[in-house]
Amino acid sequence: MDYVGGSLKLKNVKKKPLKKKKKDSKKLAEKVQEHSSRDKSPLEENGVSTYQMLRSKDTDSAMPMTEAQKHFESVQEQRLLQKAKNERLKTHKDRIDEYNRLLESQSEHFDMPKIGPG
């Protein structure tokens, strides 16, 4: 018995090649530019991002922050900036070396000793 790989072949049905539609890059670029210019609010044009606007709306409606909460927010922001700075300075080789060290430190599931009878 011969086995033929692939999809099921039907008799008297001719396969039509699929044609991909090509997008016009000029029209697409115009639409993107038009959309981005239309969506900008006056605050975004002044340098305030959408994230900052949403964040300020959330804090205005909530109770005022305590000193501890303010300190926590500032420390969290500093750590995030420091982490981003460190990641930016790493080369691809550094990232690969770090990943390999992580994998070496982990034990594989089949290296674990068997526990109990069996």
From Swiss-Prot:
Disulfide pairings: none
Location of region: Disordered: 1-49
Pfam families associated with the record: FAM32A (PF08555)
Entry GO terms, CC: nucleolus; nucleus
Residue stretches of biased makeup (Basic residues): 11-25
Biased composition (Basic and acidic residues): 26-43
Name of the protein: Uncharacterized protein C31G5.21
Organism: Schizosaccharomyces pombe (strain 972 / ATCC 24843) (Fission yeast)
